[in-house]
């Protein structure tokens, strides 16, 4: 399970070093558009499981087709290099409006990559409603 918050920097080639805690958990990865203008980084097998699940839904529904197009068309598969660096394609960097300072967060079965300022703003907005949200999405679990 991917956990934690890790500040990293993008180099001049749009690469970042994968946090040490995540290195042994990933071999081949897929980077794609995420929600709230962040990027999602999946282990390739998890990405295939999710994309298979989406493809197995009713493709006759326009919303399913639209989501599938956006999710898959931006995806980029790769292997981290020997220095554990991941390259962010230009179109994905633009989508998430990533600058030099980025934040890598563990989000359970995937990793999210945020512009650091955007992550700070998002966290500030969401923390205020955190306990209220818990009662709605996970009633009685915590």
Swiss-Prot record:
PROSITE patterns: SPOVT_ABRB
Pfam families recorded: MraZ
Sequence ranges assigned to domain SpoVT-AbrB in this UniProt record: 5-46, 75-118
Keyword Electron transport among record annotations: no
Localization, UniProt: Cytoplasm, Nucleoid
InterPro entries named among the record's database cross-references: MraZ, MraZ_C, MraZ_dom, MraZ_N, MraZ_sf, SpoVT-AbrB_dom, SpoVT-AbrB_sf
Single GO biological process annotation from the record: negative regulation of DNA-templated transcription initiation
GO molecular function: DNA-binding transcription factor activity; transcription cis-regulatory region binding
Subunit and partners: Forms oligomers.
Name of the protein in its database record: Transcriptional regulator MraZ
Organism: Tropheryma whipplei (strain TW08/27)
Coiled coil (residue ranges): none
CDD domains (UniProt xref): MraZ_C (cd16321), MraZ_N (cd16320)
Family indicated by similarity: Belongs to the MraZ family.
